[in-house]
């Protein structure tokens, strides 16, 4: 493992490279976490315990001679200082971050090709970043197969107070 950083206008985003033991250049995968306060290892501050799903994925890729980069989203973990105030955070920030990581990986001579792997919301972020940066490949892991507004309504129904749910509905229209 090796630390990685991405400098943004709001601060530094921190990540981890998992590198194979072999001869460079390696293919590299950018792993993008799903929604919520999810760290580079795939753990959410909203859930008890740790599953380390993204860390395990990165380790498995390394055994297959594929390097990977996973990172704490802005506002989370070691990237907490890079997060704007909650009111100023936009989905596009995450897309911009993913696109910047792809460009950084593309110019790193240790890597031969760049693939984006996005989980859940990370798949949507990855798809948009793919359209912008044209990596060699894109993999969606449990990405939404229905319109995002429909999925958000399902996820938030019964979890928000009625007034807040109605305000959310206006945004989703």
What kind of region is each of these model predictions?
Residues 53, 86-107:
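Alpha/beta-hydrolase active-site loop
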Residues 108-120:
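Alpha/beta-hydrolase fold nucleophile elbow
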Residues 141-173:
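Accessory cap/linker subdomain of secreted extracellular hydrolases
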Residues 123-133:
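Short glycine-enriched nucleophile-adjacent loop
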Residues 115, 137-139:
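Residue in the alpha/beta-hydrolase core beta-strand immediately N-terminal to the catalytic nucleophile
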Residues 22-61:
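Short, surface-exposed "cap/lid" segments of acyl-processing enzymes
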Residues 52-80:
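Conserved alpha/beta-hydrolase
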Residues 1-24, 28:
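N-terminal cap/lid segment of alpha/beta-hydrolase-fold proteins
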């Amino acid at each position: 493992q090796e630390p990685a950083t991405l400098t943004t206008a709001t601060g530094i985003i921190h990540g981890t490279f998992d590198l194979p033991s072999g001869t460079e250049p390696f293919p590299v995968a950018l792993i993008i976490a799903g929604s919520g306060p999810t760290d580079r290892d795939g753990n959410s501050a909203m859930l008890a315990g740790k599953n380390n799903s993204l860390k395990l994925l990165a380790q498995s890729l390394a055994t297959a001679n594929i390097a990977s980069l996973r990172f704490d989203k802005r506002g989370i973990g070691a990237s907490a200082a890079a997060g704007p105030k909650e009111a100023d955070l936009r989905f596009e920030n995450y897309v911009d971050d993913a696109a910047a990581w792809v460009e950084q990986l593309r110019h790193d001579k240790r890597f031969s090709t760049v693939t984006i792997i996005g989980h859940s919301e990370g798949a949507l972020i990855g798809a948009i970043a793919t359209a912008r940066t044209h990596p060699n490949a894109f993999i969606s892991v449990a990405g939404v197969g229905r319109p995002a507004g429909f999925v958000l309504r399902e996820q938030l129904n019964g979890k928000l107070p009625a007034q807040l749910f109605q305000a959310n509905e206006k945004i989703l229209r």
